[in-house]
């Protein structure tokens, strides 16, 4: 039986990356149970990976190799990355808070914190070293166009190969939060300036499917299966009368939620039509309750605990779907022992 190409896609969302990381922890557990293999990892059961912004961090964690060419981090350890380092990544000095007016007139955070975390976790690992084909969206400011970091291209061409820590700095350069990222290829021959690809592909699932088709033009959706993970969404139902008097400040705050939700939901809508099969396409996301506001940079303990609980709720409520999908992943793999 011909096996399907298995695709994993993870949305952007800052510290909310905890949510899909928790879901992946459960998926990894099911894969170990199904295969009776205590070393089973996510990387063994997917063929193409895509992550935007914080999703790129998770993908990098899942695919970075140790010295035995096995994944360096488990999904559980990626959750710990966020919980233990969130305050380092999103750490604004009093001076920076005043200078930026909380991000209104300057970037909200000094990038030294996030850069130190990437240095600690990924060191000199290069894009070409990742264990599986990878697609990570960014926006190139200097040329005014979308750009994708591709592991397959990096393996065949040095002009597409970057240090993972630099790539992630670019992929997470969310506007108003961090300054644009100016990076060079490993061979120092190409120099570019990027911002977070969430401006056009916060849900990179459709881009991942397009990447699959680019490399396999003779194959279609029926030849693939995809797991698409969100980072939690905020209700954006607004009263028309109230919003009729809003100005830039109100729309700036709400507009971020609306844009992020809209980008993610339109990709989901299109992929449901493309796949036309619930068994081959699974989208998992959660809705923030009314007592919690969706925030990319809130690192207070109670909020981090809530993000973990939201991920657990998704995993529990969709347990049957996740277990069924895990079974199909194993069936379409040659690593079943």
Predicted regions located by residue number:
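Conserved catalytic cores and adjacent C-terminal regulatory segments
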Residues: 1-337
